[in-house]
Each structure stands twice: as C-alpha cells, then as structure tokens.
A protein has these predicted regions:
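Bacterial N-terminal signal peptides that target proteins for export
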Residues: 1-20
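Acidic/histidine-rich alpha-helical segments that form the ligand environment
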Residues: 105-153
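A non-catalytic, amphipathic alpha-helix used as a structural packing/dimerization or gating element
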Residues: 42-46, 50-53, 117-120, 124
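Boundary at the C-terminal end of the N-terminal hydrophobic targeting segment
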Residues: 21-26
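Short, contiguous alpha-helical
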Residues: 41-45, 52, 61-102, 137-178
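A short small-residue
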Residues: 27-32, 98-106
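Short N-terminal segments immediately surrounding and downstream of signal-peptide cleavage
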Residues: 28-49
Length: 178
C-alpha cells in the first residue's frame, strides 16, 4: 500500500512540475502589451486600410448617393480625409493638409484624386502617431480615438452604399484560399 501511495505522490509531483513548467513557458512566450501609440496606430491603420480598399474597389460611379439628401460616395471619402487633416493640423501644430470638413468635389475631380487624398490623410496620420510617440498620443488620446471611430462610422455608412448597390463590401467577401 505504501508503494502505491508513493507512486501516486511521485506521479502527482511530476504532473504538477510539468504544469508549472508549461505555465512558466507560456508566460515567457506571451507578447508584451502594446504601448498606447502602438494600439492607436494599429487601429488607425486597420480602419484606414479597409476604407482604402473600399475606395479602390468601388466602381467609377463616385457620385452615387443613397438618397438625394446624403453625401455621394466621393463626398463621404473627402469628408473622412478632410476630417483626418482637421485632426492632424491641430495635433501637429502645422498645416499638413486640407482640413475642411467637406472639401468640394471640384477640388478632387477623379476617383484617383479622391483615393490619393484619402490615402495621404491616412498615411500622414500614421506618420504623426509614430512621430508623437506615447507621450504625444496620450496628450491627444481622446482626439485620436474619436477620429479613428469617425472613420469607422463612415466605413459602416459606405457598407450601406455597397449593399444598396447590390455589391458585397470587400471585407464581407469570402477569403481567397492561398
């Protein structure tokens, strides 16, 4: 009987030692938490990439409106880019771009012009986040979060433009197998 108890104790000790080693290994392998600027940059770039994919993917009918009272597809993208520059001009203390709430269509006549303006606003935002680092991002954290959310809200609006046009938004399409 003592032999059985001893065997059980040895086995239990080995199991516990292996569990402790596995737990320690898992803790060592866990990635470091993101810094504030890394988290803001990741979110900014994620929604920016989604918007740019939509902007590139949308047919050339950039004047399409859900209803007569709403902005056109182009105007939504211009509004996003202009708002991005409103933020960037304030946090950087310099005029980085056209920060009007609704830049006029006449200033951005083609799909390529609109996409380039949107892309530049997103790229400039990412560069500003990196330049500011954690201290700068934390100083303007409410702004960065608010404007990133603003991009996300308009992304959702553009999904409605896709659906109303019987199109499937890029992020809702089946993933291509590799």
């Amino acid at each position: 009987m003592i032999r059985i108890v001893r065997s059980i104790l040895v086995f239990a000790t080995l199991v516990l030692a292996n569990l402790a080693a596995a737990s320690l290994h898992a803790q060592e392998a866990a990635p470091a938490p993101k810094t504030p600027s890394q988290a803001v940059l990741e979110n900014w770039n994620d929604i920016g990439k989604r918007l740019l994919t939509m902007a590139d993917d949308w047919p050339d009918n950039y004047s399409y409106k859900l209803t007569p009272a709403t902005r056109s597809f182009s105007q939504v993208l211009l509004h996003i880019a202009g708002s991005n520059y409103d933020l960037l001009n304030r946090v950087s203390g310099t005029k980085m771009g056209d920060g009007r709430n609704d830049p006029p269509d006449a200033d951005y006549k083609t799909k390529a012009d609109v996409v380039a303006f949107l892309k530049k606003s997103i790229d400039d935002g990412a560069a500003e986040i990196q330049k500011e680092g954690d201290a700068g991002v934390l100083k303007h954290l409410d702004d960065w979060i608010g404007y990133t959310e603003h991009m996300g809200e308009h992304y959702g609006l553009l999904v409605a433009y896709y659906r109303a046009s019987n199109l499937v938004p890029p992020s809702s399409r089946p993933k291509k197998s590799q």
